[in-house]
Regions:
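Membrane-interface helix-boundary signature
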Residues: 7, 85-92, 113, 117-120
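Small-polar-interrupted transmembrane alpha-helices in polytopic inner-membrane proteins
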Residues: 12-76, 91-103
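Hydrophobic cores of alpha-helical transmembrane segments in multi-pass inner/ER membrane proteins
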Residues: 12-17, 70-79, 124-139
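C-terminal transmembrane module of polytopic alpha-helical membrane proteins
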Residues: 103-150
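Alpha-helical transmembrane segments and their immediate juxtamembrane cytosolic regions
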Residues: 2-3, 81, 94-95, 110, ...
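Interfacial helix-start motif at the membrane-water boundary
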Residues: 1-13
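Alpha-helical transmembrane bundle and helix-membrane interface signal
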Residues: 24-32, 79-89, 140-149
């Protein structure tokens, strides 16, 4: 398994466990997989487009982006819970959004775990924003989507 370092990998594995507990049964497994996939794509895109200097070489083997994908999975699952009336999920989405916004403004993650801090900041931002944008776009295109979400 390729990853930044052991502590970063361990943080991601702990995040998987916490996210699983928080969003368990919030949406069908395929929907959760879509959230993770879109979050990872958003994370990778943000890493390449927003890093300093922009790293537009998409040929490199990706070894990062899981933490951004996990942010996307968390936000997507929480939005699914919010659509079902869980108010705490709304507050957690706001908290995650404020966290990634703060990280982007500061240029460093709130919890440092390796040598790729700028990459992690962009990954967290990209993973979160792509889900928020996808959900918003879906509601704009199909206002009748109601509780289904992605």
């Amino acid at each position: 398994l390729v990853h930044e370092n052991v502590s970063h990998l361990m943080l991601n594995l702990v995040a998987v466990a916490v996210i699983t507990i928080l969003i368990n049964r919030s949406a069908p497994p395929t929907t959760l997989a879509v959230y993770l996939l879109l979050g990872t794509i958003g994370a990778t895109g943000a890493e390449h487009l927003l890093s300093k200097p922009p790293a537009l070489d998409f040929v490199v083997v990706e070894t990062r982006g899981l933490s951004g994908g996990l942010h996307g999975l968390l936000v997507g699952g929480l939005l699914a819970l919010a659509r079902r009336g869980d108010q705490w999920a709304v507050w957690l989405v706001i908290a995650v959004t404020l966290k990634v916004g703060s990280e982007a403004a500061l240029g460093q993650p709130i919890i440092a775990s390796g040598t790729v801090e700028n990459v992690a900041v962009m990954a967290h931002l990209g993973g979160t924003l792509v889900i928020l944008l996808a959900e918003g776009l879906q509601r704009w295109v199909d206002p009748e989507c109601g509780a289904e979400g992605l």
